[in-house]
A protein has these predicted regions:
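Membrane-interfacial loop-to-transmembrane alpha-helix junctions, especially the N-terminal start
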Residues: 7-10, 123-132, 169, 174-179, ...
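Membrane-embedded helix bundles of polyisoprenyl
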Residues: 15-19, 105-119, 127-211, 231-251, ...
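Membrane-interface coil-to-helix junctions
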Residues: 18-113, 135-157, 196, 254-259, ...
């Protein structure tokens, strides 16, 4: 009873500390959520999943028509499509999902800390050892930080810790439920990090197996090990099968993403052990423990028990040999984030080390040598570390550990308080480095900005635009680049469709079209961030008829003023689906240069076989645009240096500065200015950004994780009637602008391209189904601005037809003259196979339960 009271006090203290630490980390006036990644991905995608569930009632969705033009929803499964944490939020329709996700993240963190404590206590560690180790786990680099940033990095931890308990239960009581259930929930919460989690579970499983055999005084034979190992692996495999409905279609979606880019690596680099102190220790993107962890792993190699040595060696190899990090990151890159799932296992090894140290079961030589080795290693790595402060902290940490280890060998008093003496400084150093990381990043969302971004008044403006129009068009929210970043995936209404997307997985054709074919501006340093475009031609092509904005937008007419922003309308925007016979072939399109490669979409659809040549297109478009001068004013004032060269400009800016550039006057109506040039970065480790009339292009540092390779800056900016100048903002840096071309013109309002408009059935169009009618005046092509995917199934009047890629990246098919009922159904590749696999997993679980019941009888 006394022990249970002590446990309860520890658990209450751990929960209180967790909540306090999370709230303290937000600072003054902020929320427990970060800008960009959290606000535009980890809180927004769950809201969209819930929104689609309410609209369709489908628990297993397949298509996300609303985001990124319309994509396989398993491109976004990483963000919690079937996560039990997210699914609970479905039961709270009146609570903003972003509010729920903040609370859920703190609850998950507290649950993980408590379960870890209970697991350690169940392994017969003292309450002090278990509690202090749980505190170390709480303050480890990624735990609090990622709970408000990249929540998928850590929100699976309760289920992972639960599964470690399940392994103990499996070997001690021969019960599989907790092992299978915990693994299944971990996968469903974060399939990406579950791979590392399963590897950690496997290592611990081997350790527990050997220890169980030793206690039972049984010999381990090769045959017995293989047989028992297969039975254990069978439980893990059953959990994987249960998650088949998530894993199979997600794998198919990832395999279809041919546009993914990985780091170049060689075999020697992958197999050579490396310890990057700044990434491996303390950081939020790795296990994030102190240098004590290195000491413990090295000391473990000298333990007496073979299985204890194997566990330490296994962890050391996985953590230091880049091959494992590379493999756990899907063979894309070598980054320590995939090693975060080893954190609970490292905490177990810490508790084990403290127990042995206190009971003097580690020889003095084997206790001191690892400490000395780590101190020397850290000292020698001084020049390799970017932060001298962190180097000093690491060295101090290692020296303190060395001194405590020496002192406890001679002092019974220190041995009595050994856990506090060893882990106290470690926890303090984790808190200090954690606070430093929070302060340095400074990217938490302010409460004021959060309330503005999630204000229902914006949603009401979107609702009004949709309700006013019975057609099939897109409605987008536009602000400055920071606001646009927050709203990359935000959808307010299940009938709102947007072109933007920010996801680690995406439709490769759509991404390639934006970047290489059409050459949309890239305002962000991360190539995955596909922003709303300010290009009026792209907006017209993609059917962006309505914009919600607080600024006047050339080419759009203000319709209404609302509390959430003004509603602007462009009556000339293309429908999302229409029929036309004005076509040109892909081969001819590929011959077009800028800006004809963009303007062609105002007059023609690009198909496999077209009717006009590139020359004819240029001749036709010459009616709308003409080449013009675009001269940047030269300047040399000590802060800004802009000098013209034979082929462009040499620029050296100490800070961002704005210039006024003359352009041909728009005499009759709003027009468009097209500008394109190449950029050569003289300081490639720094970013470059240049804006024209607020439309920004950015070239990221070559060292950036998601380097965007944006070396050609392309602009198409709207000009108002009578406008004679434009604002050009040159960002800080040293670079060359060359091969510049500029054109000025108007967008022709009557090109006859949209000959027959698809009338969508808004009641039937939801989930993975698009349905409606069209009255085609003549034979032609049915054109959409929905990205092409092999999962589409099309029927005309109930007859299945073959779909093809049109406009280089979108869905289309041949259509004969007449009245037709169109039905477009999307089947995510792998969904059926995934459901079958899940069904087999359920049958295996049921069969196992029945068999166990019969054996018990």
């Amino acid at each position: 009873m006394k022990e249970r009271r002590k446990d309860l006090l520890w658990e209450m203290a751990l929960v209180l500390l967790t909540v306090t630490a999370c709230l303290y980390s937000t600072g003054v006036g902020n929320i427990f959520g970060a800008k960009v990644d959290w606000s535009s991905q980890h809180s927004v995608f769950p809201e969209y999943f819930r929104q689609q569930f309410y609209r369709t009632g489908q628990f297993f969705p397949e298509f996300a028509l609303n985001i990124g033009g319309g994509q396989n929803i398993y491109n976004f499964s990483y963000y919690g499509l079937f996560s039990p944490v997210v699914l609970i939020g479905y039961l709270l329709p009146n609570v903003k999902m972003s509010d729920y996700m903040m609370v859920a993240s703190i609850v998950c963190l507290a649950a993980a800390v408590i379960i870890l404590y209970r697991w350690l206590k169940s392994r017969e560690f003292t309450a002090v050892v278990s509690g202090m180790t749980a505190l170390m786990f709480l303050f480890a680099g990624p735990m609090i930080y990622q709970s408000s940033h990249q929540i998928m990095f850590v929100n699976y931890m309760p289920f992972l810790c639960l599964t470690f308990l399940g392994i103990d239960r499996y070997f001690e009581q021969k019960k599989s439920g907790l092992l299978i259930g915990g693994t299944f929930l971990m996968i469903m919460t974060s399939f990406y990090f579950s791979i590392g989690g399963i590897l950690a579970l496997g290592l611990y499983g081997i350790y527990r197996y050997a220890r169980t055999k030793e206690r039972a005084e049984e010999m381990i034979t090769v045959k017995g090990f293989l047989g028992d190992g297969l039975r254990f692996a069978g439980r893990i495999l059953t959990a994987i099968m249960l998650a088949g409905v998530l894993l199979v279609p997600t794998a198919m979606a990832l395999l279809g993403r041919s546009g993914s880019r990985g780091e170049k690596t060689d075999l020697w680099q992958l197999l050579t052990p490396q310890i990057n102190l700044e990434k491996f220790l303390y950081g939020a993107y790795g296990p994030g423990l102190s240098c004590l962890m290195l000491i413990i792993l090295l000391t473990g190699l000298f333990y007496k028990k073979a299985y204890e040595k194997i566990l330490s060696l296994g962890c050391l190899v996985v953590l230091t040999v880049p091959f494992f990090s590379y493999l756990l990151n899907g063979a894309l890159y070598i980054r320590p984030k995939s090693l975060i799932p080893f954190l609970p296992l490292l905490c177990y090894l810490t508790a084990k080390y403290l127990e042995k140290l206190k009971n003097q079961k580690i020889g003095r030589i084997w206790m001191l040598l690892p400490c000395l080795a780590v101190v020397i290693y850290i000292y020698l790595k001084k020049d390799d570390m970017k932060s001298e402060v962190l180097w000093k902290l690491l060295l101090l940490d290692a020296v303190i550990t060395l001194l405590i280890c020496v002192a406890q060998a001679y002092s019974a008093w220190i041995r009595k308080y050994l856990t506090v003496a060893v882990l106290g400084p470690v926890i303090l150093s984790l808190i200090i480095t954690g606070s430093y990381s929070w302060e340095k990043s400074g990217n938490l969302e302010s409460r004021k900005a959060y309330e503005e971004d999630t204000s229902r008044s914006i949603g009401k403006a979107v609702d009004k635009a949709i309700a006013s129009d019975g057609g099939f068009y897109r409605v987008e929210q536009v602000g400055n680049e920071e606001k646009n970043a927050e709203n990359l995936n935000r959808v307010w209404n299940s009938e709102q469709y947007i072109t933007s997307l920010y996801s680690s997985s995406y439709n490769a054709d759509y991404q390639n079209f934006r970047k290489n074919d059409f050459q949309v501006e890239q305002p962000y340093r991360n190539f995955l961030m596909q922003s709303v475009s300010q290009n009026p031609v792209f907006r017209q092509l993609m059917g962006v008829k309505y914009l919600i904005s607080s600024q006047n937008i050339p080419g759009y007419e203000k319709k209404w003023m609302t509390g959430g922003g003004d509603v602007y309308c462009n009556e000339n925007a293309a429908p999302i689906a229409y029929e036309t016979d004005q076509t040109m072939s892909e081969a001819e399109y590929d011959r077009l240069d800028f800006p004809y490669n963009q303007l062609v979409f105002t007059r023609y659809a690009v198909t496999k076989d077209g009717t006009v040549s590139a020359g004819q297109v240029k001749e036709k478009l010459a009616e709308d645009i003409e080449k013009c001068d675009f001269r940047i004013p030269e300047k040399n004032n000590g802060i800004s240096l802009v000098v013209s060269t034979e082929n462009g400009y040499q620029v050296k800016m100490k800070k961002k500065q704005e210039f006024e550039v003359a352009v041909p006057e728009q005499e009759e109506k709003d027009g468009v200015l097209f500008v394109q040039f190449r950029i050569e970065n003289k300081k490639p480790k720094e970013d470059i950004e240049i804006s024209l009339e607020g439309e920004r292009n950015k070239l990221s540092s070559i060292q950036h994780v998601y380097y965007n390779r944006n070396t050609v800056f392309t602009y198409a900016v709207g000009l108002e009637k009578g406008q004679k100048t434009v604002r050009l903002s040159l960002g800080k840096g040293e670079y060359t602008i060359k091969d510049m071309s500029a054109y000025n013109g108007v967008l022709n309002e009557d090109t006859g391209l949209y000959q027959s408009v698809f009338r969508v059935d808004k009641e039937q169009t939801k989930g993975n189904l698009i349905q409606g009618r069209i009255k085609s005046q003549k034979d032609g092509m049915f054109i959409t601005s929905i990205p092409f995917d092999k999962g589409f199934e099309m029927t005309i009047d109930g007859v299945k037809v073959k779909c093809e890629k049109v406009n280089k990246a979108f869905l289309g098919f041949h259509l004969e003259a007449g009245k037709h009922k169109i039905r477009i159904l999307y089947h995510a590749p792998g969904v059926t196979a995934g459901k079958i696999l899940t069904g087999l997993g359920v049958l295996i679980v049921i069969a196992g339960a029945v068999r166990k019941k019969k054996c018990a009888e």
